[in-house]
């Protein structure tokens, strides 16, 4: 079992280390561009207030954080979590002018943040890549405020 988890972790990391520069283009091709509409709708469902706090896990290139920030007047506190070094650097580069967004290199299974902090926990196209879904979900529950919303987008 442990080898399987390690193998998946290595495989996922290797894939994202290779595709990080073209990740958004790949999503455009695989979804025929519809992923952009889905992400807009995802943010619509959140309907974030200016003081909302978001933790975006498996942030990748930062598109969910960017949309969330824009929708709420670039005011909310947003924490982006990304485990892959190349995607982490790409996301930070893409959102370098957003002062309300901070980046942490970490895994969904072990979030280095306090309990009961966030109004929203988002993960888009990432839950399939975590090595321990149950542990990741426990972490989501831990970091959300009571009444906070878990939002997952997959295709």
Predicted segments with their positions:
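Class I SAM-dependent methyltransferase SAM/SAH-binding core
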Residues: 53-110
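Conserved alpha-helix/loop element of class I SAM-dependent methyltransferases that forms part
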Residues: 32-50, 67
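A short acidic, Gly/Pro-enriched loop at the edge of an enzyme's catalytic core
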Residues: 109-121
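A short SAM/SAH-binding and catalytic strip from SAM-dependent methyltransferases
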Residues: 119-132
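N-terminal, positively charged/glycine-rich alpha-helical extensions of SAM-dependent methyltransferases
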Residues: 1-24
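A short glycine-rich, Lys/Arg-flanked "PGG" loop and its adjoining helix->strand segment in the class I
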Residues: 134-146
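Conserved beta-strand signature within the Rossmann-like core of class I S-adenosyl-L-methionine
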Residues: 147-154
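A generic alpha-to-beta junction signature in SAM-dependent methyltransferases
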Residues: 46-48, 72, 95, 144
